[in-house]
């Protein structure tokens, strides 16, 4: 069951890529693969929950939206919301749990007359905290084409649009995250549109390695929380580089450990209960990796230990979270005995 939200969003994506292709032939390969990318994520044979997720998005109530704040810590859709609409929307949005990246708020902040309390999607991650750490160090996003790799529900992609990006394309192969994005798109509507009416924020449900090599379409590429999941970090860095225009900016955020340029942790089995973590370099080692991959002007702009206030269990993500993955007797270590999660953000030029 597809509703107008998903169909219209996909049409806007197609028209955006078509406009690019008219100026840059590299975008034609994206256009030719787009139908396959979009059809695969809806295929029940590949994703058993896809029909249920589509139905949840299709049944969301249509609200009168007064304002959308894409550049606030809580991505806020200021809309008229009755009690019945609140109950309906909350139930449907909770069918898209777990919500990991956010937060989001839907409803009126005035609470006057018939208005219900806003819906607050309190996600597992305070993704706004990460954005606060990253944003001051970015080049100006105004008018730029941006690729957000591993964008989850799309929170950071919306923030990039709010910061003035001309076009943001979020990629992530998760069927759930794709439909979470579409649920938020349902309420955002055309609030992020250009003057000519084209949406600026789009989502393609594929991993980075599915994209055409060496597209060179983007002024800024973000890879946040992805590198440590890659079995070949240098291949990932080369793929990121291939999507950038010459002189473009890479924003890389990943797990790191203390140490010198020769220090890299390779977890034996799991790290913080994740079985798909392969390499945790020191900041110095990571700088060396980026330089070896051909990036220049590499700089580390932030290092932060992840706290149980930033990543935690909530009403909207009621599974295990960071507190369950740390040593109960020593929170500076994971349950496996490794250093607790610490994240660094590096910025580099192609």
Curated annotation (Swiss-Prot):
SUPFAM superfamilies: S-adenosyl-L-methionine-dependent methyltransferases. GO terms for biological process: tRNA wobble uridine modification. GO terms for molecular function: methyltransferase activity; transferase activity, transferring alkyl or aryl (other than methyl) groups. The keyword tRNA processing applies. It catalyses: carboxy-S-adenosyl-L-methionine + 5-hydroxyuridine(34) in tRNA = 5-carboxymethoxyuridine(34) in tRNA + S-adenosyl-L-homocysteine + H(+). The keyword Mitochondrion does not apply. Its EC number is 2.5.1.-. It is an enzyme of class 2 (transferase). It comes from the Bacteria. InterPro entries: CmoB, Mo5U34_MeTrfas-like, SAM-dependent_MTases_sf. Pfam families: Methyltransf_9. Keywords: Transferase, tRNA processing. Carboxy-S-adenosyl-L-methionine binds at residues 101, 125, 130, 150, 172-174, 208-209, 224, 228, 343. Catalyzes carboxymethyl transfer from carboxy-S-adenosyl-L-methionine (Cx-SAM) to 5-hydroxyuridine (ho5U) to form 5-carboxymethoxyuridine (cmo5U) at position 34 in tRNAs. Homotetramer. Belongs to the class I-like SAM-binding methyltransferase superfamily. CmoB family. This is tRNA U34 carboxymethyltransferase. It comes from Psychrobacter arcticus (strain DSM 17307 / VKM B-2377 / 273-4). The lineage of its organism: Bacteria, Pseudomonadati, Pseudomonadota, Gammaproteobacteria, Moraxellales.
